[in-house]
Amino acid sequence: MDYVTPAGFRDVLSDEACMRERIARDVQACFAARGYLPIETPTLEVMDVMRAGGRMPGSPFKFFDASGDLLAMRPDVTLQVARMCATRLAGQPGPFRFRYMQRVFREAEGRMQAQAREMTQIGVECIGEAGPQADAEVVELMAEALELAGARGCKLALATVGVLRALLAASGASAQWTEQVLAAFHASNFVEVDRLTGEAAAVPPVFAAAIRALPRIRGGREAVEEVRALVAPLGCEDGLDDFARTCDLLAEAGLADRILVDFSVMSSFDYYTGIVFEAYAPELGTPLGSGGRYDNMIGSYGESRPAAGFAFSLEQAMAVAAAADRSVDDEAARPLRIAVPKGSLNADTVAALEAAGLDTTGLDDPGRQLIIRNPGVEYVIVRPTDAPAFVSLGAADCGICGKDSLLEAQSDVVELVDLAYGACLSLIHI
């Protein structure tokens, strides 16, 4: 018998535990200095109670208690804080500022069972205050906390969901089409956004064009005005003035070089109503933290209050800090690494890479080689179904696979472009 931990769980030995303790102390002291008070929420929640607050990540552990209630181990803390405020603090004037450091439990993506299913979430929630000042406060606090956690030099990508929601509402789109567009934005699947807003779009062309263009807008403070020019003729500037003011406040706080306005940022949680933001580090392929404004969520449980907050993964922040300690020169010298599929997709893939100007020597007949190294690029030869996992886990910078493999993997990757080859013929035998 192998005496091992369950998949997605691990032991933490003394050296790492001491580092976690130090980070927790420094970050919590930072939050406390801003007036945030500690809270704790239960590990288990009634499933229907969590669902009432909006879409959430899946919990890997669900079971019935003796009363017949379906319970789940918490996948997120924000929903619990909203429930607590609406029930335990009903009638109290506020505002409230809360901080926490708690374990959360997430389902592994697709077949990636080695992925962590237990992680430590550090965050704050500012309850009862609205407007740019409160939004800037939580963004600034996240930047400061990540610095203290060792994830220095992170970039914060900001947007506001109000513009997209206003475009969808004004377009006259059906509820089904609106849900499809929102799902594509939440998944950062802009190939799907392009398809939905193409020639057969279910909305007037001017709205389809605006929705299609929105996630391509990114940059500094000037990007806000680019969005305004896009949506003002359609009367869809919802939340843009507040967002612009928030960006100005962050610049005044000295964060101008850390902030990126990026309207492709739309959280996978559907409960956000205003500003949304994500923290990125060059050492990590996925966001290490995110947050935003969720003014409607507390009202789902009772008394409505405006609210904003953020959370980040302690483990991911530590991974960024460890990666940053490695030689910058070694990382800069590493070539682009692409996961290339074997089999029927190989010939078209080689042609596409050649058209992009890459050296594909040896790629058309790799034999038993697993890695082909050419000037400026490395090719990792994989099964088509494995390409998403290689990218998600950092073994490749990008990859090529079929749409079916991408959907089946359910990995945290972004579909950049449809290469328009490899379509399969489906046969039904009767």
Name every feature range the model reports, one short phrase each.
Residues I39-L71, M119, S426:
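Polyanion/phosphate-binding surface patch
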Residues V49-F64, N374-G376, G394, Q410-L416:
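Glycine-rich loop at the start of a catalytic domain that most often binds anionic cofactors/ligands
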Residues P388-A389, I400-D412:
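A ligand-binding cleft/hinge motif common to bilobed small-molecule-binding domains
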Residues V380, D397-G402:
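Paired acidic/hydrophobic, glycine-rich loop segments that form the ligand-binding mouth/hinge
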Residues S59-G68, A173-V193:
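Acidic, His- and aromatic-enriched active-site or binding-groove loops in soluble protein domains
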Residues A332-L393, V414-V417:
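N-terminal hydrophobic or amphipathic helices and topogenic motifs
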Residues E16-R34, E45-D48, T78-Q92, R97-R152, ...:
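Positively charged, Gly/Ser-enriched RNA/tRNA-binding surfaces
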Residues I428-I430:
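Conserved small/polar residues in nucleotide/adenosyl-binding loops
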